Design a protein with these regions (language model features):
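N-terminal beta1-alpha1-beta2 submodule of the flavodoxin-like/Rossmannoid cofactor-binding fold
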Residues: 1-125, 211-273
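C-terminal/domain-terminus segments
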Residues: 6, 20, 165-170, 202-210
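Short connector loops at secondary-structure junctions
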Residues: 37-44, 186-203
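Short aromatic-enriched loop/helix-cap "lid" or pocket-rim segments at secondary-structure transitions
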Residues: 46-51, 160-162, 203-204
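Structured loop/turn residues at beta-strand edges in well-structured enzyme cores
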Residues: 89, 107, 142-143, 187
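Well-ordered beta-strand positions
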Residues: 93, 146, 190-191
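Short, glycine-/small-residue-rich phosphate/pyrophosphate-handling segment
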Residues: 124-182
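Oxidoreductase and adenylate-handling cofactor-binding alpha/beta cores
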Residues: 174, 179-190, 194, 219
Length: 273
């Protein structure tokens, strides 16, 4: 299996760098081939601008979706973007590894998504009609790929609990897991999250390293988060609202979009136990 490992941390000697090497060693031990995108080492350009679309007329107002669509269709995006798209096409699995900065992914990783998930590949796929609204949320170009997040956070685990001040970790990661990965069709596994990343000794690192190894061993077999498929009957089309008979009369929030309302962390604990 080919796994694209996208790493977004500026320091090779960091905790994240050490965790990455643990993941690499276990994935290779399982016989997987790793395709690496180390964004800081690559000097990845994070902003979308006119330079991304060399085929777009210089005197024409830049319309990013239209320019992205035209560039992708003619393989005329910049060389760095085309290379990443080639990696994605070759990969059977995707792992995004990053520290949680200001409740989201680092800007360099967001820029990788913005530039690489082109119109016609990451979005804008399939027919839009009264019967279906594109190939997305469970369908699309990533439909046969598995995906997972490896995340470090400085706060304590209770800070990210259902009643924690930072908000539930499932909610904070929802725009990435459901929006970035499930949107183009990937089967998204529960995340690996390490808390108190700035307060870790050798004994705890050894424990966390083994926990990460276990997740890498289960990459092919773990059950994905049971997100609801957009075109599977759970949503109205074209409004894309959850059907009124699903989720309960008072239910709301991100959990509605999972067929299993129990938190991801709870499901993962049950698997690990």
């Amino acid at each position: 299996m080919k796994i694209l490992y996208v790493f977004a941390h500026p320091e090779e000697r960091s905790l994240n760098g050490s965790l990455r090497e643990v993941a690499f060693a276990e994935l290779r031990a399982q016989g997987h081939e790793i395709l690496v995108s180390d964004l800081y080492a690559m000097g990845w350009k994070s902003q979308v601008d006119r330079q991304d679309f060399p085929q777009w007329p210089a005197d024409k107002r830049l319309l990013v979706p239209a320019a992205s669509k035209a560039g992708f269709a003619s393989a005329a995006l910049t060389a760095d973007v085309e290379a990443e798209i080639a990696k994605l096409r070759a990969a059977d699995g995707i792992i995004l590894h990053f520290p949680l900065w200001w409740f989201s992914m680092p800007a360099i990783l967001k820029g990788w998504v913005d530039r690489v998930f082109a119109y016609g590949y990451g979005y804008g796929v399939g027919e839009h009609s009264d019967a279906r609204w594109g190939d997305r949320y469970g369908e699309g170009m990533f439909q046969d790929k598995r995906a997972m997040l490896v995340v470090t956070a400085g706060g304590w685990a209770p800070h990210y609990s259902a009643r924690g001040i930072n908000g539930p970790i499932d909610d904070l990661l929802f725009p990435i897991q459901h929006g970035v990965l499930f949107y183009p069709g990937a089967q998204v596994l529960p995340p690996y999250v390490l808390y108190q990343a700035d307060r870790i000794d050798e004994a705890r690192f050894a424990s966390e390293a083994e926990r990460l190894r276990a997740r890498m061993r289960g990459f092919l077999t773990e059950a994905p988060i049971p997100y609801r498929r957009q075109n599977g009957g759970d949503y109205s089309i074209p409004g894309c609202e959850l059907q009124p008979w699903l989720g309960g009369p008072d239910a709301s929030g991100f959990a509605l979009h999972s067929a299993d309302a129990s938190p991801v962390a709870a499901r993962l604990s049950a698997v690990a136990g």
